[in-house]
Amino acid sequence: MKQVMKKAFWKKTAVFLMTAGLAACPVLAADSQAKETSARPSMQVLVGGAEEREELGATELDSLSEITDPAEAVVSGESQTEAAMSAAEAPAEQIPDGMVKSSLTGEYVPAEIGNRRPVAFMIDNVKDADPPSGISQADLYIECEVETDLSRICAVFEQYDDVAKIGPLRSCRDYFISLAAGLDEIYCHYGQSAYALPYLESDDVDNLSGLMSYPYNAFFRDGPHAAPHNAYTSGEQINELIRTLGYRTDHEADFTPQYTFRAVGDEDTLPGGQDAAYVDLGYPFNHPCFEYSGETGLYSRYQHGSAHVDTENGEQLAVKNIILEYQSGVTYQDTHYLHYHTWNSGKGKYITNGKAVDITWSRESFYSPVVYKTADGQPLKINTGKTWIAVIRKDQLKDCRIGTDSENTSCVADAETVAAEEEKIKKWSAWYKEIEESYLSKMAQIRNDNVAKHGGKTKVEVGLP
């Protein structure tokens, strides 16, 4: 029922979506709303110069999920299942009655909160959108650069009911869907790029868009910013919209949190780690950085040259942990939109308590949970508390710095590693450009075939679940 309702809403805004974004992607513009059926046609792609057969998933829209990036060696041989089993072998933590460990922070929260699906909000992060509203109450943050080197934040809330104003909200990018997919979240945004549309349209994503014609309007515009930096919502309105759309509100019984947390009160001080009292992400426009306080044990955030503050309560954003993921990023052909190969593996940093250590990350597919491991291949156990996850493009590693203060920093990777990673990204970019046209053309063909199969109508128009 919920999916029929959801698909009907997409039909109402077909004209807007076609005119607002799909011009950037001509091969998908032929039919922006048809969705893949259970048939699995295959396509030829080039991987490192060799032809391989890859099948296109019915609802995953995940044709590249099994392709190994030739510029990145697989860094983890242990499967996600094995990692989960290893974590399960640890002594059970004694959790107070009526409480559960939060899947976002590892802290104890009431069961009705911890068992509920979180909501991820896409937050505008340009200077004209500062200061934000409500996001100091988020439990997890995911930051990534979008087009023209601007950054955007995905603020994930477990307890959002009483937050009166959340925003400013901005549009979705496809890689943010992948970065948050393992959280079993409901995804809230205000519009989307053309490349995100097929994923949002799939049954794998429950989303709330400020540009949709819903029976209940959960979004509003308010000061102090001018449009498009003034779109907001509230916890109460989001709850009502979720009920209206009939989305599942609780985690399913087999849900496994994607992060492994240490026991409450058992902190890892990362002995022997690199000094990391100051962390500069190296993003060129908002210049985000974090400073560690030994008194609070938290990293306070700064950007645009001043404290990053929530205007609703005056609180500066602060987190216990910072995780850096080094990823390959290229632009879609003939556009300025970025594409990250999120379903891959790579290196990164785990930063907490004023120290930093090397880690690895991996995702098996576009929608898979992320797996973090220590340098020796063990599951990474994160200190309880809020975490800031930042994706660092490999060609910008030289700008990301860690040290004791803003004057005494070093690049997150040595010069030799930076040079090697920059060479890898060149090879990866060339490889991706080889297969992109074939990939997008095949996706358009499948969508058009589905239209013909349903008598000239899209799945949206015939109301299929």
Named regions from a protein language model:
Residues A24-P41:
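Sec-dependent signal peptide cleavage junction
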Residues S42-M43, A71:
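Ser/Thr/Pro/Gly-rich low-complexity, intrinsically disordered segments
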Residues A30, F220-R221, Y439, M443:
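Intrinsically disordered, low-complexity regulatory segments
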Residues M1-L17:
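Bacterial Sec-dependent N-terminal signal peptides
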Residues G48-P91, T417-E434, S438-K442, I446-N450, ...:
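Ser/Thr/Gly/Pro-rich low-complexity, disordered linker/stalk segments of secreted
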Residues I67, G77-I142, E147-K427:
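A surface/extracellular/periplasmic glyco- and lipid-processing/surface-interacting theme
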Residues F16-A24:
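Bacterial N-terminal signal peptides
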